Amino acid sequence: MNAYGTLLKKLIRFTNIKLTNLAEIVGYDTSYISKWCNKGKLPAAKAAPNVNKCLADVFAREIIIQEEATLFAAEFNASGPYDESSLSSTIFQLLKDAYKRSYDNTSENAQLAGLSSQRMLLWQLDIKNFFVTELPQLLHQLNEPCQILCTMDICGFLKDLSYETGRQAYYTNPVHIKMGINLGGHCKNNSYIPQLYYFLNHYNDISFDFYENTCMDYMNLFIVKNCIAVQCALDKDYRISIAHIITDTAQVNSLYQKVNSEFTLSRLMIHSSDSEELFYNGYRTEFYAHNTFQIMVAKGFEFLLPPEINPRLIQAARDQGFDESMAQLVAHLGITWEEIFEKNTLDFYVLKSSLMKYIDDGEIIFADVIYHMTPEERKLHIENVLALSKKNRNIQFYVVDDEQLVNKQQMIHFSIFNNRKKLFLKNPGRYHTDVGPYFYSVLSDQLIQRISSYLDDLKNADYCSHYDAESLQTFYDKY
């Protein structure tokens, strides 16, 4: 046992804290902490400061609760003061010093880095544990924006992904992943469209860019800059059968630099972007110069607003600290939408859950402006929807009962804007957090066509109900 393991074990015994409780607080599986205590293993060097700080806080809190500060000082040869903050600092320094001694005396030191910085995973359980548990924990410990490359085809993995348990924790630092996609490989029909959509929704705190990958699919690499690289062997079903893990930073970054050159702009098919970039590329101007639209709304309903709302949105833009260009954009979009609603064809897909939430809280996001409609404004909005849909019979509504989508209703966060020539996704949740993309723009004509076709087919799904002007009025009168 090394110095770090000895100290950690002694602290656990002194505080009598349960290993399961400690693991839950620190964010690591109990097997990892057990190995740190008994097997001479150490937390990853990059993660160690955060791990030690978390451990120190836990132990200090327990010592104060148990009123054992004086005994701790005698047992661990520590001096006062004995308040919780000071105890935490003392324990952190003890752990830090023990970690350094242990690191210098194990095969993880710099002299043996070439031998110890690689390992091979051969069993499915180990491979799954690495990607599902160990890798996310490692990314959570990083104190910097995370840049990741994955040369493999996302569509090859979609069929095996499960979202039943949901996410336990979301990233607080920006995570950006460049990933491969091959529409001619595992994406030969439209079945992958909802799977890809659910994937983006499930990881809506991560920004993805997808690149056509036929030229690099053979590499089978997953690389986290400044951290770790994984070279994978895939079986005939595109499942990872062997994972070769590299943690030597120099090797990892050499791989990253070489592989990153394969992700060229000409191969970009789906791109995460912010509001400024979306506007620059015409998604808030030329996008509306068409006459056919498919719009799937995942939050509120910012369309068919009564005229008196537009000045209030403009004022809200100013009140929320946007510059005058946002107020001008809101004014322009208001006029543009009024013209579109008069005669163009619009298919609105509205989630039942989001519709009920809008009726309850009235929140909409118009462009980038968050606005809460009052009950009276919501009533005017509904009346205006009825009036405009009667005036323009090309406006159709499809209510998607997302409660019938087993384990999927918590996974629909992105709204879809499509004119069959250009398509982008909007992430309403991003306006309430600090990570994740605001938008995805779809740059592949083939992908736009397939998504358009999928939305057309969605109209005939059992969980999708059609409402034209008359049935909408009947529904309103009833409820």
What are these regions, as identified by a protein language model?
Residues 473-479:
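Hinge/cleft segment of the Venus flytrap/periplasmic-binding protein
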Residues 27-46:
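Recognition helix of helix-turn-helix/homeodomain-like DNA-binding domains
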Residues 1-19, 25:
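A short, Lys/Arg-rich alpha-helix, primarily the initiator
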